[in-house]
């Protein structure tokens, strides 16, 4: 396909002028109002990412696009030159000077016709490895033509038209007798052949491949050609990559459609079933029949009220109408997504990535990224092939350079908004505390949804980039007022909808967890889950959702083991044992009597122990109480665990059975931290305390409490939005302005997501520089005093000054950081101390290391259980590897936790990693060549971060 290929649904964006300057793009973006996205439309999902069916790649019409067989293509291609020359009169030789500008442009493009081959014109089974100029270019804005003067002027050259191949094929198919075809471009009438009257009339109508009734045959593009066209004409790379990842997470077309369809069916069932139970059954018939002496046999049909929908209150009908509109919109959205997006994504996966839906169940995302990078030369935005056509303007949506496409950039595009949200929570920008409740319990899914609704639509534009007005400091106060008004509007809407939302959540959770509660009551009360606040706190930058969920699931087992090691309180444990014994005794008596007193004439199960309450009712009540208290009574304290262990150790049955459980909460928490990557310095030397356990339980909370908080949040969300979050509008604007950096080929992204360690002014290198100056100052003092004898003024003893200087250095470092005190005792030189200080409790470096592990590192060995402890000398061998380290080859557990001295008896930590990573394939981008690698990019960052170690 040539650069002027026809698009059945033209992009309006192609008609705009493309600014190569980023600043001018931002200024122009400020003046474009976003009237299509409103607050209510976001509530009902009208403008979600899977409902904004833009014109860039979603719409395809098989009536307009066709694929011809190879014989027809060859026959038409042989007559291409003859058709072009037949359009020109032979007697006019001097028309080139007065020719329109578009003809001269097409004359240049016709000379390069032999070098450019379209992916759409290739066979359906053709390979992707074509020539470097074979990718499809976006449409170039057409320059309007002007009439050509009719005067005869002498000229030695001919004017030649370059007709798009698809136009020739299509028109040639309509006219099988090889009649002269019409050029797509506007040309004077005198350059055209004298056509018959019937063909001339049809030519004036069919100008843009409009549907014709003369041809009864239906033309359909092969799926592979459609996939190639989809990829070659992508303009919004952020949205497309998000769709690709959404399809990967959904595990295929069928699974996505069925899951979304069944979710709607569940919602419909909840509404219909609830209304039927409340207004559709006359319960008085049942209770009146129970109190009558001669009870009649009644069925459910006798109790159903005919035409009960008319008796429903008007307010309930209004609520049902709102839910009906919501369900209708979601159904239409599902249909549009299936018809125009999901099917195209399926073709893209199957034909270009060579991944079927069945394979999506087991394939890794790393493999998908590798396959995506192989397609970069087939899209003009991502292609690194140099073009000699200087008149060609690539369609660039948010940048003035090539769109980068590697593992790091793909993750940044998919998680552009999530990275900002992670930084917002970790930097404590939002104040969510209300009265006695802290932010860890108040941040629920409902509040999180409202925050995204208010912030995302305000901060980001339609292309997914940061709004240019946010980056201007003089707009700060005005933007803060606008964001405050959005929070207050959301608070009003939530206040109106809160009663209905509460009812919906109560019914949803009741129907969802009742069966699980019935089968295992203790599982509901004892089951734990990470809170929404913990999910944002523990998530790393550029960590996709499936990788994050994998980490959380792997940490749940060790987390439960860690919590169970703490005593639950003597009063609670003994009270549970008492209740369990009493309820179990009553339950046993009732069950035995029911078995013994059962005969044909009498049934003990229907015997009323109290008025209106049978024995079966009390059996179910006491059985539930016994099941709940049984799980709590078994969780005894530390002393009972030790006594049980000692008793089992005295037995000769199995001497090793006593050592299966070791009470060591400190080692257990470090083992949990290997999965959560969360072990703050405030927990240092306190890992065995109840205080740390309570703080961890705020992140890993009981599921029943999370459900209660979710229901209460529906009532508290309006007040939090109005009185708390609205006062943080200025801080939110400042955060997005200060922590947004522009990357060529990527746009504006969160600072922490770029892993740029060269910046020294954003809490990355300040502590390291301070520690360097402090140690240099102390080293000068030591050199000044030497190893002379001096008297300690406190003890009065003569000591070595070198030892005293070491103590002074240690005490001074303790005032700045507790973590450095332990490290200074175990390392000999300042370089290793600098390295450890740099690693101190830094989320960005943790995210970077985990990113390397996920996308390119060698297979990491599974974390060892905390019972397998090493001696201090073994750890010294591990630390010694740092002295001869290569980039990311050996990371000691003490590096990430910050206190090595406190960890000499333990080998578990946040990271017990042996990285052997070569990122030359995945993290390398061909667009960042020459000198740009020295200052930016992942490889440049690695060189900058480890250049001192390599030179050493």
Curated annotation (Swiss-Prot):
Residues 1-33, 69-159, 806-832, 855-889 are annotated as: Disordered. GO terms for biological process: autophagy; cytoplasm to vacuole targeting by the Cvt pathway; lipid transport; mitophagy; piecemeal microautophagy of the nucleus; protein localization to phagophore assembly site; reticulophagy. Phospholipid scramblase involved in autophagy and cytoplasm to vacuole transport (Cvt) vesicle formation. Cycles between the preautophagosomal structure/phagophore assembly site (PAS) and the cytoplasmic vesicle pool and supplies membrane for the growing autophagosome. Lipid scramblase activity plays a key role in preautophagosomal structure/phagophore assembly by distributing the phospholipids that arrive through atg2 from the cytoplasmic to the luminal leaflet of the bilayer, thereby driving autophagosomal membrane expansion. Required for mitophagy. The chain crosses the membrane at residues 261-281, 309-329, 578-598, 615-635. Belongs to the ATG9 family. Keywords: Autophagy, Cytoplasmic vesicle, Endoplasmic reticulum, Golgi apparatus, Lipid transport, Membrane, Phosphoprotein, Transmembrane, Transmembrane helix, Transport. It catalyses: a 1,2-diacyl-sn-glycero-3-phosphocholine(in) = a 1,2-diacyl-sn-glycero-3-phosphocholine(out); a 1,2-diacyl-sn-glycero-3-phospho-L-serine(in) = a 1,2-diacyl-sn-glycero-3-phospho-L-serine(out); a 1,2-diacyl-sn-glycero-3-phosphoethanolamine(in) = a 1,2-diacyl-sn-glycero-3-phosphoethanolamine(out); a 1,2-diacyl-sn-glycero-3-phospho-(1D-myo-inositol-3-phosphate)(in) = a 1,2-diacyl-sn-glycero-3-phospho-(1D-myo-inositol-3-phosphate)(out). Residues 806-818 have a biased composition (Basic and acidic residues). It comes from Candida albicans (strain SC5314 / ATCC MYA-2876). Phosphorylated by ATG1. ATG1 phosphorylation is required for preautophagosome elongation. Forms a homotrimer with a solvated central pore, which is connected laterally to the cytosol through the cavity within each protomer. Acts as a lipid scramblase that uses its central pore to function: the central pore opens laterally to accommodate lipid headgroups, thereby enabling lipid flipping and redistribution of lipids added to the outer leaflet of ATG9-containing vesicles, thereby enabling growth into autophagosomes. This is Autophagy-related protein 9.
């Amino acid at each position: 396909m040539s650069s002027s290929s026809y698009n059945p649904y033209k992009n309006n964006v192609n008609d705009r002028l493309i600014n190569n300057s980023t600043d001018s793009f931002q200024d122009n973006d400020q003046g474009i109002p976003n009237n299509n996205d409103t607050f209510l439309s976001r509530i009902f999902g009208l403008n979600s990412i899977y409902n904004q069916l833009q014109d860039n790649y979603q719409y395809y019409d098989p009536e307009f696009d066709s694929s011809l067989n190879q014989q027809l293509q060859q026959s038409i291609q042989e007559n291409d030159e003859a058709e072009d020359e037949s359009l020109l009169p032979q007697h006019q030789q001097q028309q080139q000077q007065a020719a329109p500008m578009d003809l001269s442009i097409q004359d240049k493009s016709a000379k390069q016709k032999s070098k450019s081959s379209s992916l759409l014109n290739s066979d359906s089974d053709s390979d992707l490895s074509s020539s470097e100029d074979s990718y499809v270019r976006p449409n170039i804005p057409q320059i309007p033509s002007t009439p050509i003067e009719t005067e005869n002027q002498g000229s030695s050259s001919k004017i030649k038209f370059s007709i798009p191949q698809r136009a020739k094929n299509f028109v040639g198919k309509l006219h099988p007798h090889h009649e002269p075809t019409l050029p797509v471009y506007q040309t004077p009438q005198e350059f055209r052949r004298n056509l018959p009257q019937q063909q001339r009339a049809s030519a004036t109508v069919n100008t843009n491949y409009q549907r014709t009734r003369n041809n009864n045959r239906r033309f359909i593009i092969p799926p592979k050609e459609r996939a190639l066209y989809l990829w070659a004409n992508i303009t919004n790379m952020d949205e497309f990559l998000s769709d690709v990842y959404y399809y990967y997470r959904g595990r295929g077309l069928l699974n996505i459609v069925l899951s979304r369809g069944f979710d709607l069916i569940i919602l419909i069932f909840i509404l219909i079933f609830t209304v039927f139970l409340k207004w559709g059954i006359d319960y008085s018939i049942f209770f009146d029949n129970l109190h009558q002496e001669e009870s009649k046999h009644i069925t459910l049909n006798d109790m159903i009220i005919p035409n009960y929908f008319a008796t429903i209150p008007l307010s309930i009908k209004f609520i049902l109408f709102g839910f009906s509109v919501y369900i209708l919109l979601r159904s239409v959205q599902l249909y549009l997504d299936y018809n125009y997006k999901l099917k195209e994504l399926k073709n893209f996966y199957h034909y270009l990535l060579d991944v079927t839906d069945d394979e999506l169940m087991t394939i890794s995302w790393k493999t998908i990224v590798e396959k995506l990078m192989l397609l970069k030369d087939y899209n003009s935005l991502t292609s690194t092939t140099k073009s000699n056509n200087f008149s060609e303007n690539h369609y660039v949506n948010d940048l003035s350079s090539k769109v980068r496409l590697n593992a790091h950039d793909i993750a940044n595009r998919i998680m552009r908004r999530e990275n900002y949200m992670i930084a917002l929570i970790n930097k404590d920008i939002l104040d969510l505390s209300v009265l006695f409740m802290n932010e860890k319990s108040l941040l629920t899914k409902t509040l999180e949804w409202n925050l995204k609704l208010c912030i995302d639509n305000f901060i980001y534009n339609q292309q997914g980039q940061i709004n240019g007005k946010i980056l201007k400091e003089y707009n700060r106060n005005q933007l803060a007022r606008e964001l405050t008004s959005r929070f207050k509007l959301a608070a009003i809407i939530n206040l109106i909808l809160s009663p209905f939302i509460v009812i919906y959540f109560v019914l949803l959770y009741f129907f969802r967890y009742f069966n699980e509660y019935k089968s295992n009551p203790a599982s509901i009360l004892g089951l734990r889950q990470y809170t929404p606040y913990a999910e944002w706190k523990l998530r790393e930058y550029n960590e996709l959702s499936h990788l994050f969920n994998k980490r959380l699931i792997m940490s749940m087992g060790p987390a439960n083991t860690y919590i169970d090691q703490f005593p639950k309180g003597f009063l609670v444990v003994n009270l549970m044992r008492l209740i369990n014994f009493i309820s179990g005794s009553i339950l046993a008596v009732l069950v035995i009597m029911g078995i013994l007193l059962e005969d044909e004439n009498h049934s003990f199960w229907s015997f009323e122990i109290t008025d209106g309450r049978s024995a079966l009712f009390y059996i179910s009540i006491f059985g539930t109480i016994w099941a709940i208290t049984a799980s709590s009574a078994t969780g005894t304290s530390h002393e009972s665990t030790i006594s049980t262990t000692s008793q089992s150790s005295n037995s000769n049955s199995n001497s090793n059975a006593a050592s299966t459980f070791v009470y060591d909460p400190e080692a257990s928490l470090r083992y949990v931290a290997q999965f959560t990557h969360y072990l703050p310095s405030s927990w240092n030397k306190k890992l065995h305390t109840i205080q740390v356990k309570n703080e961890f339980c705020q992140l890993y909370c009981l599921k029943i409490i999370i459900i209660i908080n979710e229901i209460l949040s529906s009532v508290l969300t309006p007040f939090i939005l109005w009185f708390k979050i609205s006062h943080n509008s200025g801080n939110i604007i400042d955060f997005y302005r200060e922590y947004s950096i522009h990357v060529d080929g990527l746009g504006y992204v969160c600072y922490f997501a770029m892993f740029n360690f060269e910046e020294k002014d954003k809490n990355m290198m300040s502590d390291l520089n301070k520690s360097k100056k402090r140690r240099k100052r102390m080293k000068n003092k030591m050199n000044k005093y030497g190893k002379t004898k001096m008297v300690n003024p406190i003890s009065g003893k003569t000591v070595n000054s070198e030892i005293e200087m070491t103590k002074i250095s240690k005490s001074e470092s303790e005032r700045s950081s507790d973590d450095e005190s332990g490290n200074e005792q175990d390392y000999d030189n300042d370089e290793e101390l600098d390295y450890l200080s740099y690693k101190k409790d830094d989320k960005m470096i943790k995210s970077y290391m985990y990113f390397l592990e996920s996308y390119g590192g060698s297979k990491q060995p599974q974390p060892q259980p905390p019972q397998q402890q090493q001696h201090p000398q073994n750890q010294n061998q591990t630390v010694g590897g740092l002295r001869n380290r290569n980039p990311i080859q050996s990371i000691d557990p003490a590096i990430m936790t910050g206190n090595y001295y406190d960890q000499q008896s333990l080998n578990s930590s946040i990271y017990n990693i042996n990285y052997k990573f070569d990122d030359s394939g995945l993290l390398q981008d061909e667009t960042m060549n020459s000198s740009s690698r020295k200052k930016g990019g992942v490889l440049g960052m690695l060189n900058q971060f480890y250049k001192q170690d390599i030179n050493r």
